[in-house]
Amino acid sequence: MTLYIDVLTMHKRTSSVADAGRVEDYLTTIYRLEEALGIARTTDISRELGVTPATVSKVIKKLEEKNFVKRVRYKYVTLTDDGRKLAEQIIRKHRISEVFLVKILGFNDVEAHMYAHYLEHLPDVVIERAFEVIGKPSMCPHGNPIPGVERYKEELETLSTADIHQKCVVQRIAGEFVNILTYLHSLGIRIGSSITITRRGQRYVFVELENGSSIELPIYIARYIYVKCF
């Protein structure tokens, strides 16, 4: 009987942790999508989390009951004040962790993003001490703002909408979704990279990199890349 109770208690605790993690994943994904694209669609949430639209709808309904999110219209979701506050707390810890991993431990921007998912669960006092050690940065390694830190807001445009035949410098990779970060890293595209837009199609943006190589970037990825063009 005692063993049964212990196992049952452990199961409840594990389920509680898993549920909390799932809530955080959804809130931060919605936050990143709103930050990057201005809106969070069910289809985008589904793609970024690797779950079905039906699963997203089911979880969103539960988050709505907890007053973390609200449906703006069919297939659109936005964070409430409570949801945004919780998401910003997690995003702040995550982005501080990313800078620490890059600046102090020497990881690249993709590795830092992946390992920061573990560090973001450390106590606030640890994260804030790391924040001081790395010089209180205002941005993460991907150019995204760290919540709670004032910074100069520069006018940027996305690679998906910038005029062709312009030379642009990558200033920000919004959203920080691992599949996009990994893809861009494999191409050698990161913050500070120079890109020349040569042509734009319905589904692709054609660009030339500093090394002279030509690349077809899918529009859905180009919309996450914020640039300053000359």
What are these regions (language model features)?
Residues 2-50:
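Extreme N-terminal segment that seeds HTH/winged-HTH DNA-binding domains in transcriptional regulators
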Residues 60-61:
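Short, hydrophobic-biased segments on the C-terminal half of alpha helices
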Residues 64-72:
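A short, conserved structural fragment
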Residues 75-94:
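Basic, amphipathic "hinge/linker" alpha-helix immediately C-terminal to the N-terminal HTH DNA-binding motif
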Residues 121-226:
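Mid-protein regulatory/catalytic core that forms ligand/cofactor-binding pockets
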